[in-house]
Amino acid sequence: MSKRNPKILKIFLYMLLLNSLFLIIYFVFHSSSFSPEQSQPPHIYHVSVNNQSAIQKPWPILPSYLPWTPPQRNLPTGSCEGYFGNGFTKRVDFLKPRIGGGGEGSWFRCFYSETLQSSICEGRNLRMVPDRIVMSRGGEKLEEVMGRKEEEELPAFRQGAFEVAEEVSSRLGFKRHRRFGGGEGGSAVSRRLVNDEMLNEYMQEGGIDRHTMRDLVASIRAVDTNDFVCEEWVEEPTLLVTRFEYANLFHTVTDWYSAYVSSRVTGLPNRPHVVFVDGHCTTQLEETWTALFSGIRYAKNFTKPVCFRHAILSPLGYETALFKGLSGEIDCKGDSAHNLWQNPDDKRTARISEFGEMIRAAFGLPVNRHRSLEKPLSSSSSSASVYNVLFVRREDYLAHPRHGGKVQSRLINEEEVFDSLHHWVATGSTGLTKCGINLVNGLLAHMSMKDQVRAIQDASVIIGAHGAGLTHIVSATPNTTIFEIISVEFQRPHFELIAKWKGLEYHAMHLANSRAEPTAVIEKLTEIMKSLGC
């Protein structure tokens, strides 16, 4: 037995060593095949400002709504629907969906309007690389960036700022390019998606000095699917918006309108998210952006490349009929959706009224009744009503980093005019026997956006000197009367046109200078009130 023990011990040690070797090989193979990087799903990032990004706001029911899709057949160029609705009837596919691709490939297309000579574009699986967009971060508080130049806030797009995925074998024109930014090194096989010839045809510069949306499209590269890597995804439909004159209400309304039209033309089932592809600081007007859409975010707030499952490129506000109508005659008048549904008319529109209702509904304000404050004058005269007369004031406020805090006066004796109106109403010397007046001091700059819209909604008559604040009349109710006081230096048609396109009654008082005679204003208001039945 003693001679056999060493032999048995050797066999035992050999078997133990062999088993240990097998265990080492197994665990090494297992750890390499199931690494944490491969077992974890890709990170999905949702655009949001409130950690509720999965929630998309539904479209509200609007009395003036008319169908947007499909667009009208044989829509005449220059029709009211062409200007204000879905005139984007020519579809151009720059990258078609891959047949049998399982829905993971990219596509990119634009819808062109012959009337507006602009395009609404959309794409699937569009990758944005923030490091390839040169601009300030955006979204800062105003006081943090005082003195910053506007050029720093507007985007400059490097090649490949946006990318789509395409099979290299499917198209000619691919070349190997260096990739800069986005934490990527080396090179990638890519091609320019939209050439200059196509840009000139479908995204004309027109009179716009810096057409940032055209520049964005020009930056898009189609890369091989193997080079299209996305760690972060935005699953909800997202509008990409670049704003000019972002602190001015009139120009911001053109941006809101363009974003609304883009959402409707592309048939979005719910309200989209918005990504600002600019570097502007925050303003009070973002209250309305947030109310209108499902969420807002700034492009530079993304710290790494991000992919949008469905992105829509909203045309610049300068390309809307609201702006283009200032320099050219748009022969359209406002009408009710009910009338247009029964009797279509290429020279009439309800789209501006629909948009105004959208703003009111976004703030939770009623859209099915005209006003809330037409009430009996007293218990003894129950048939008489009180009408709100809103005097929209211009007041000093700090608008943007290059602003000194002083607004340019359009009516040098505005305070005197308002005080005279107030005294006229307060002393009961209006001479109106069938109704009363509630004069509202419209210091809008110091009101929330919701309260501003509510004041417009509740007004029967809106008075004001020419100024951006009057743009709120897009949200006015039917039968509202607009009374604009126009100084000799500001003979511009902005608000006369909006009133016309909404079908509102409009009166203008043209001044010989910048001073209005209070008695003349009172006489004109008396005339307007009598036309209301007072």
Swiss-Prot record:
Glycosylation sites: N51, N301, N479
Enzyme nomenclature, EC number: 2.4.2.38
Membrane topology (UniProt): Single-pass type II membrane protein
GO molecular function: glycoprotein 2-beta-D-xylosyltransferase activity; xylosyltransferase activity
Reactions this protein catalyses: N(4)-{beta-D-GlcNAc-(1->2)-alpha-D-Man-(1->3)-[beta-D-GlcNAc-(1->2)-alpha-D-Man-(1->6)]-beta-D-Man-(1->4)-beta-D-GlcNAc-(1->4)-beta-D-GlcNAc}-L-asparaginyl-[protein] + UDP-alpha-D-xylose = N(4)-{beta-D-GlcNAc-(1->2)-alpha-D-Man-(1->3)-[beta-D-GlcNAc-(1->2)-alpha-D-Man-(1->6)]-[beta-D-Xyl-(1->2)]-beta-D-Man-(1->4)-beta-D-GlcNAc-(1->4)-beta-D-GlcNAc}-L-asparaginyl-[protein] + UDP + H(+)
Tree of life domain: Eukaryota
Record topological domains on the Lumenal side: 35-534
Compartments where found: Golgi apparatus membrane
Membrane-traversing stretches: 12-34
Topological region Cytoplasmic: 1-11
Signal peptide region: none
UniProt KW keywords: Glycoprotein, Glycosyltransferase, Golgi apparatus, Membrane, Signal-anchor, Transferase, Transmembrane, Transmembrane helix
One GO CC term, this protein: Golgi apparatus
Associated pathway: Protein modification; protein glycosylation
GO BP of this protein: post-translational protein targeting to membrane, translocation; protein N-linked glycosylation; shoot system development
Mod. after translation: Glycosylation at least at one of the two sites Asn-51 and Asn-301 is necessary for enzyme stability and activity.
Broad class of where this protein is predominantly found: Golgi
More about this protein: Renders plant glycoproteins immunogenic and allergenic in human. This is due to the presence of beta-1,2-xylose and/or core alpha-1,3-fucose which are not found in mammalian proteins, and which constitute epitopes for carbohydrate-reactive antibodies.
Function: Glycosyltransferase involved in the xylosylation of N-glycans. Possesses beta-1,2-xylosyltransferase activity, transferring xylose from UDP-xylose to the core beta-linked mannose of N-glycans. Involved in the biosynthesis of glycoprotein bound N-glycans. Does not require metal ions for its activity.
Protein name: Beta-1,2-xylosyltransferase
Upper lineage: Eukaryota, Viridiplantae, Streptophyta, Embryophyta, Tracheophyta
